[in-house]
Amino acid sequence: MGRILFLIFAVLLLAFSSGVHLSCQNDIPVQHEKPQGPRGFVPIADKESTVRVLIVGSAQDVLLAVNGGYQIADTASNILEQGQLLARSKVSVDYGGIRIGGKCYKVNELRIKSTRDGAIEINNVPYRGCVCLSQQPDNKLFVIEEMEIEDFVTGVVGSEMPHLWNDEAHCAQAVAVRTYTMYKKKARRSEKYHLDMQDLAYRGMAGESPRLSSLVQKTKGLVMTYNGNIFPAYFHSACGGHTEDVSHVFRDESIPPLSGVVCKYCGNSKYAKWKRDISKSVIERKLRAANVAVSNIRSIKTLDPGYGNHGSRVEIVSAGGSKEMGANDFRLLVGPNILCSTAFIAKSSGKNITFSGNGWGHGVGLCQHGAQTMAKKGFKWPDIINYYYPKSELVRVY
């Protein structure tokens, strides 16, 4: 009997030490599924450190110059010409080829590369890396820059934020830009380019400085994720008191990092409150150019305001009746530098509409003026990231 009891005790001890559950409810192992990211967001798989950016789209011609050694090649990397200091030349599409100055290359795509780190100038703006000139079916030109992501991030940070702002604000902005860039690169991996000039403010090398390059290097390769998926880390100038849920503005699926937060830090911005008088005829002309038929506007109002009072839609009442359209679409048509945000109240005043609103930009993600205030108060860049993108995680991808 003693031997049997000893064996039973030994079996029980082995079971507990192995973590085996002995209750009837737990005798079947539970299969834990890997959390799935929201629809539309993508896992990080592409760790290549280059990105393609459309810097000129559908142009009749552009001006090209290279301040140093250069090569002109076709898509198969065959060198068609090389030399030193390519003088400023007009580039256009010409009879089934691409003409640079007085010479026509019978190809529909050319790659211009600086061989000694010189700048490639397009329309007098300096760029890095490699520039692709691409003929489109309508005989217009696309100009695409291919460069290192970190160089692109530096150029965007210097274009999006004043150079004299706080280091920690710049570092937070760099992480947001890199995350957005990697997301777009993954989402558009099969396209000719990953981003265009409407995605982010970008002025090539003109946005760079040694200080900004050093700050960007502090966060090199770091991006934000949620549930293991990279997401579009939107940012804007000033939210006016509360950032918006991404689903409210862009119809992307809502996730905690983009669900909106109270912002206590941009109230002193000159964009916290604003007022604009815009001619009704100007608004009507811009809407008609986008095939939105309106005449004699009587009233404009936002519908379905979000946490930050940014409207989801806009109702326009005119002589022809009532029309609705996306609030962000309306703002972009009128002019994003004229109509600062979609968080506004509009009043008809004779020939004008008076818009009174809060904030500058779409209101999603990082509030740049809020980030600057946080940095001045002593917050570090990870604090800023955690504040504006709650529950996000930092991952180094390269």
Locate predicted features.
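Conserved, single-site charged/polar hotspot
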Residues: 2-398
